[in-house]
Every structure is written in structure tokens, then in C-alpha cells.
């Protein structure tokens, strides 16, 4: 599959001394990373968020393997054409970033994975595809607000608009094309400092149990922290706490 050029949204100035790339999860968009991007820009960074293939205003394609997402990300470089100071990915965006970083050791200096979907088994795969179909076809702001009354109003609105802006085919194929959804070997091959910021397993997390233990044991460069009381969308549940975990690790 041919890699594509991903559309970008920037916060801060291109001449900033440090550059962060933000990679959204399935059914989201570049704009859904706004709170993280804004916080980095306020600290003097240039924050770039992209629409993954099939999402937002990105080109539509015929395949949506994690390797395809990774190929697109490897074509995504900072405006100064160097490497990223840090790449932050959520869910499948995190898995794709892991694959990209394992393929090109100079792509980014550091990696932050927000509740990464590194391995997804059959039961969870079905939950994901059912949820994506419902979000694309039926989800309303009232539903999101009732389930997440603590979310910022912008996040509520974007939780509804982003999956509808994405290609329904892309949302389905991102699950169906990845019949063996397992990027653990790529995580083990990482050669850069990597932080996993996980959701609370008591709420909902895709990085937990024996899977998380195996990933952490496979690579001493990977560290793990959990934001209590958050689910899979921890950057929406508790954005400030998520940012504090990231910035304290980056120091």
C-alpha cells in the first residue's frame, strides 16, 4: 500500500525549539487532541496533530492495517525536517506510532502511549467495531454528555462529530484488516524512552493484565503509569492529570 501525506493542524509557532506530534485514536481526528496540543504550545512547543488515513480530511484508502498507519506517520516530519522530540499517540494511534518508531529509530526521540491498543483480541475487536459503527451512525451529544458529564464541552461535541467525519469503511477496516492485532514485538524492539500512560483498569483500559506485564518485561525503556479514575480516553477524562504525567516524565 502506498503511504499518504496526512493533513496537519498546528498549535504554536513553526520556529519553536521543540516539536511534538499528536496521533489520535480510531474514530477521532487531529482536532480531538486540542487540549494536549494547547498545553504544549503554552510551554513553547510547536504541537502538530494529524488526521490518520480515512479520518477527518485525510485521504481515503483501500487498506487500514496498522502498518499502513505507521507508513503514513513515517512520512510525517517536523516543519524543520529534523526528528520529533516526542510523539504522543492514543489507542490505535499509539500502536501505529510504536510500529513507526521501531522501523525508524531516528523518527522521534521519545514516545508517549496513551492507553495504547497494542494487542486486541477477538472479543475486544468486536466491541470496537460495534462501537465505531454506532458512533458513526447514531451517537448524539446528549448520550456522550450523560455518560461523561465531566468532559469539556468541546470534547463532547468532537466525540460525536469526529466519527461521523471519518469514513465508515475506514472505521470498519481498521479492525477487519488487522486480523492479528498484535504489536508487542514492535514494542520490544523500541530503542527510545517510552512512557505508557494507561487508563484505570477498574474503569476501562486496553493496557492491563498479562498483556501489559509482557510488554513492560520485554523492554526496560518502557515505563508505565496509570491515571486513577480514567477510562480509555484518559486525555478527555482527566486532561490535566494526563498532562502532568507527561510533562513530569519529559523533564
Protein language model regions, located:
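Catalytic histidine-centered segment of alpha/beta-hydrolase-like enzymes
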Residues: 230-239
